Structure formats: C-alpha cells, structure tokens
C-alpha cells in the first residue's frame, strides 16, 4: 500500500490531548504493520513543525521535526517547480473550497505519484477526490 501523510495526521500524532490522537495512533500502527510505503512533502513537514510548536511548544516541535526529517519510514518528496505549478492549478480549480496551498501541493504530488489514499483528518482530501484512511 502507498499512502500520503498530511499535516493534520502528524499534528494529531504529536498532540496527545487531541480528540483524534488515539485514532491517529491506531492508523499509524496499522500502516507500519502493513509495511506501507509512506510519502509526504517538505511543505507538509514545515507546516507540521510550525503548528506543533504553536500547540505544544518548542521541545515537542523539535522532537517532531527531528522525527520527520530523519525518518526512514517516509519518502520525503521535494516538489519541483513543475509540481508547484500543478499545485497552483489545483488551487485555482477549487476556488470554492478553502484549500491551503500546502494542500494543493499535496494533491499535485499524490496525483503525480498516483497515490489515492491519504492519512489525514482534513476533509479537503475527500472533497477533491482522494480517499482517507479509517482506523
């Protein structure tokens, strides 16, 4: 199985008081047990570290950042300028949705790598046609 990991999943995994923390842990363990091939982007990592720092402080953000940048479980995609342009097309196409540009980069990467499934708690992935994992 190939799966894209979104900011929302990482933030929930590192924020132990989040309503979905236990659900996220179950999904994460299931992905590891299945030896899933996991992808994310530099944009997602940057956004995650920013949000974790705001919610849980510098030390947790430092641990999170180290985990993500150094993970042997993640394929860290560095989007090209061509993929950034495709992301911009996603952004324009879905003007009626409240998409972040980071989400659009994720969609462009998923589309380019033919990944249909995301580990996310963000409804926007389903709104544009991708699937999200359930526990």
List the model feature ranges, each with a label:
Residues 1-40, 53-67, 134:
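Short, well-structured N-terminal submotif of metal-dependent ribonuclease cores
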Residues 9-10, 47-48, 86:
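A general alpha-helix detector
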Residues 34-35, 71, 128:
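Structured helix-beta-strand junction loops
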Residues 42-43, 103, 122-123:
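Short secondary-structure boundary segments
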Residues 45, 82-83, 124:
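Conserved beta-strand edge residues that scaffold enzyme active sites
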Residues 107-135:
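Acidic, PIN/NYN-like endoribonuclease modules and their adjacent C-terminal/linker elements
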């Amino acid at each position: 199985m190939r799966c894209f990991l979104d900011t929302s999943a990482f933030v929930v995994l590192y924020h132990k008081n989040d309503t979905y923390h236990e659900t996220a842990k179950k999904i994460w363990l299931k992905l590891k047990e299945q030896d899933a091939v996991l992808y994310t982007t530099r944009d997602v990592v940057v956004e995650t570290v920013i949000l974790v720092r705001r919610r849980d402080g510098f030390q947790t953000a430092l641990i999170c950042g180290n985990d993500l940048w150094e993970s042997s479980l993640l394929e860290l995609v560095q989007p090209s300028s061509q993929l950034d342009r495709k992301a911009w097309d996603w952004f324009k196409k879905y003007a009626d949705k409240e998409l972040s540009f980071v989400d659009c980069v994720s969609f462009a990467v998923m589309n380019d790598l033919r990944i249909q499934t995301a580990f996310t708690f963000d409804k926007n992935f389903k709104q544009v046609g991708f699937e999200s994992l359930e526990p």
